[in-house]
Amino acid sequence: MAMAKGLIFLGAPGSGKGTQAVGLAETLGIPHISTGDMLRQAIADGTELGNQAKGYMDKGELVPDQLILGLIEERLGHKDAKAGWILDGFPRNVNQAIFLDELLVNIGHRTHWVINLKVPDEVIVERLLARGRADDNETTIRNRLLVYTEQTAPLMAYYQEQGKLYSLDGNQPVEAIATNLEKLVKP
């Protein structure tokens, strides 16, 4: 049996990683797995994991890694993920990456590529301010970028050491990024 082709998308808020992950998933015919969407769905469906997650979220706490990994394991067990998958929003730190690697080995999957969309901070600030969300002001955005950079720098180094990290210029037209992604991942 061929091993599933696993892709992880990294990028700061506003980098376009969600847009690109969804587009590439459609092109390749594999699922785009957003941990945020999965959590919301599990809560809406009233699953055991969803109810546990809701308990943490209602208290304003982060959902524990093991709970998220449970959701990911369940999702990767679906038939549509056998040929591959794109994970968006997880892992966010090295501990999560190590847990994820162990989980993937246990279920016969592996990460082939970790794709990082690089976009200058100034461009991200402009993009997020242009969205016009109530909670998006320049100070908040810059703080989120700082936290993101601090959290993900060690994660990038982790995947770089494994030879899996590919950084792409995310400061170009959506179509150009999509073309570059397809060239990278298509055999």
Swiss-Prot record:
Q: Where does ATP bind?
A: 14-19, 131, 172
Top-tier EC class: transferase
Cite the EC number: 2.7.4.3
List the residue ranges of the region (LID). 130-136
Catalytic activity annotated for this protein? AMP + ATP = 2 ADP
- What cellular component GO annotations does this protein have? cytoplasm; cytosol
Q: Specify which residues bind AMP according to the UniProt entry for this protein.
A: 35, 40, 61-63, 89-92, 96, 133, 144
Q: In which pathway does it act?
A: Purine metabolism; AMP biosynthesis via salvage pathway; AMP from ADP: step 1/1
Subcellular location per UniProt equals: Cytoplasm
- Tell me, how does this one assemble? Monomer.
Q: What does this protein do?
A: Catalyzes the reversible transfer of the terminal phosphate group between ATP and AMP. Plays an important role in cellular energy homeostasis and in adenine nucleotide metabolism.
Q: Anything noted about its domains? A: Consists of three domains, a large central CORE domain and two small peripheral domains, NMPbind and LID, which undergo movements during catalysis. The LID domain closes over the site of phosphoryl transfer upon ATP binding. Assembling and dissambling the active center during each catalytic cycle provides an effective means to prevent ATP hydrolysis.
User: In its UniProt entry, what is this protein called?
Assistant: Adenylate kinase 1
